Amino acid sequence: MSRTIYCTFLKREAEGQDFQFYPGELGKRIYDNISKEAWTQWQTKQTMLINEKKISMMNVADRKVLEQEMINFLFEGQDVHIQGYTPPSE
């Protein structure tokens, strides 16, 4: 059964995560406040960051950079900037 949360990213009620998949306090914050829809949007941005900035998930410093970008995107309203990327026009 799905659960509904108030998503702080989308600023509305939405379907919450099924379980806490990110560790620690940040993981609890994501589980409590970020919807599946918002998380999917982050995953798209994350993939772009990993590819364009050649981030290695084996490198602790790179993981910290990615985590900070995630916090900025999901909780602080800062969009991910990829140099040279132009989003498709609607």
UniProtKB/Swiss-Prot annotation:
What are the record's GO terms for cellular component? Answer: cytosol
Q: Which Pfam families match?
A: Iron_traffic (PF04362)
Q: Which UniProt keywords apply?
A: Iron
Tell me where on the tree of life, at the top rank, the source sits.
Answer: Bacteria
Q: Any signal peptide, and if so, which residues? A: none
Asked if the Swiss-Prot or TrEMBL record annotates the protein with the keyword Iron, the reply is: yes
Q: Which GO terms describe its biological process?
A: cellular response to oxidative stress
GO molecular-function terms, A-Z: iron ion binding
Name the NCBIfam families on file.
PRK05408.1 (NF003817)
Q: Which HAMAP family match?
A: Fe_traffic_YggX
Q: What is the similarity comment for this entry?
A: Belongs to the Fe(2+)-trafficking protein family.
> Quaternary arrangement and interactors, per the entry?
Monomer.
Function in brief: Could be a mediator in iron transactions between iron acquisition and iron-requiring processes, such as synthesis and/or repair of Fe-S clusters in biosynthetic enzymes.
The entry's protein name is Probable Fe(2+)-trafficking protein
What organism, scientifically named, is this protein from?
Sodalis glossinidius (strain morsitans)
